[in-house]
């Protein structure tokens, strides 16, 4: 059957329309998205006086995190176990007055990135040049996070990598590079997800706390047993050790955990240190997964765990992170702890521990005002 010119033209237009439809849809969708972005920016500007814009690609920060690939025996729970390790820390490592960015990777053979601030709104990855890129080698574990502290008081921030594996300490060579000094007294293996620098004894030198998650005898790439998970969802106490290292002042550290009263094996995910009682001695707070948080009070001689007596350590939660701040303008720190939540399963909510009225110093007590404060 012959088609006339009009039919052929209509058929051609139909096929052209089919070809153009996805493009038109994308353009319309893009315009709608742009309109929504502009609306959100305007509303944010009206409500808060500023708005945030995603500029990582323009700024040269193109990092893609690679998660850990662990022993195949964990295949059934791999998404849960391998969900950790993406971290970012901000530091002016070269003391040029501009903040730089360090991000960690968590796959064997993957590289971390150190983005140096170029002073023009862009960043350049100098991790290879500085010696802190190739840190996730077979047999050494993978990065879970990074914290910075000037442990030798030379004015430059040094780098501690916490890992599921061997913790790595890098000395900052005055902003020109980093030297690995891991043999400074740190253990060969800690499955850690948190650490904090703080001068617990007031000698002017930064000491170090590292919180274990999985037990230190567990190698997640070569398991001798799959019985590695918490023994309770509320009061688990079969996790990794908590380590306190005293800075000896000669570039080395001594492990003093038990001597200083820190022996817990709860599953540490976050830690922070501050003088919560106003005694001049920094205390230590640990947010634990699968259980209660811990508050270690520093009396100047050793630590004692005071979570229950201060009102904090009685409610089991899945602590994810912790931060201090005087949000009530009391002249005393409140403690904010984030918790994991899953609708219908884990509706825990975050905690805001505020000092109770009439309590202070060594008699301080806390109450949870998270719900009241919204």
Describe the residue ranges of each PLM region.
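Acidic, glycine/proline-rich Ca2+-coordinating loop motifs
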Residues: 1-374
């Amino acid at each position: 059957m012959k088609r006339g010119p009009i039919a052929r033209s209509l058929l051609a237009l139909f096929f052209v329309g089919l070809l153009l439809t996805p493009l038109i849809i994308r353009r319309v969708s893009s315009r709608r998205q742009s309109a929504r972005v502009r609306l959100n920016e305007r509303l944010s500007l009206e409500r808060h006086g500023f708005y945030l814009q995603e500029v990582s690609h323009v700024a040269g920060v193109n990092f893609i995190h690679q998660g850990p690939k662990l022993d195949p025996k964990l295949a059934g729970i791999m998404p849960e176990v391998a969900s950790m390790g993406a971290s970012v820390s901000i530091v002016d490592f070269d003391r040029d007055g501009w903040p730089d960015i360090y991000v960690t990777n968590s796959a064997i053979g993957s590289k971390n990135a150190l983005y140096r601030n170029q002073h023009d709104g862009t960043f350049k990855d100098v991790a290879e040049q500085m010696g802190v890129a190739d840190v996730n080698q077979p047999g050494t574990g993978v990065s879970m996070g990074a914290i910075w502290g000037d442990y030798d008081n030379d004015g430059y921030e040094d780098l501690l990598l916490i890992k599921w594996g061997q913790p790595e300490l890098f000395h900052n060579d005055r902003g020109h590079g980093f030297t690995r000094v891991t043999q400074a007294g740190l253990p060969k293996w800690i499955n850690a997800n948190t650490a904090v620098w703080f001068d617990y004894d007031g000698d002017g030198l930064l000491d170090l706390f590292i919180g274990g998650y999985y037990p230190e005898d567990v190698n997640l790439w070569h398991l001798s047993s799959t019985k590695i998970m918490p023994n309770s969802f509320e009061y688990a106490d079969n996790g990794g050790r908590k380590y306190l290292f005293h800075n000896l002042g000669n570039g080395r550290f001594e492990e003093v955990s038990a001597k200083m009263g820190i022996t817990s094996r709860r599953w540490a995910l976050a830690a922070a240190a501050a003088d919560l009682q106003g005694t001049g001695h920094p205390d230590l707070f640990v947010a634990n997964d699968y259980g209660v948080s811990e508050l270690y009070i520093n009396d100047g001689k050793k630590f004692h765990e005071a979570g229950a007596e201060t009102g904090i350590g009685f409610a089991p939660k899945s602590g994810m992170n912790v931060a201090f701040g005087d949000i009530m303008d009391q002249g005393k720190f409140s403690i904010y702890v984030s918790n994991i939540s899953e609708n219908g399963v884990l509706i825990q909510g975050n905690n805001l521990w505020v000092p109770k009225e009439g309590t202070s110093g060594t008699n301080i007590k806390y109450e949870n005002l998270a719900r009241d404060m919204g």
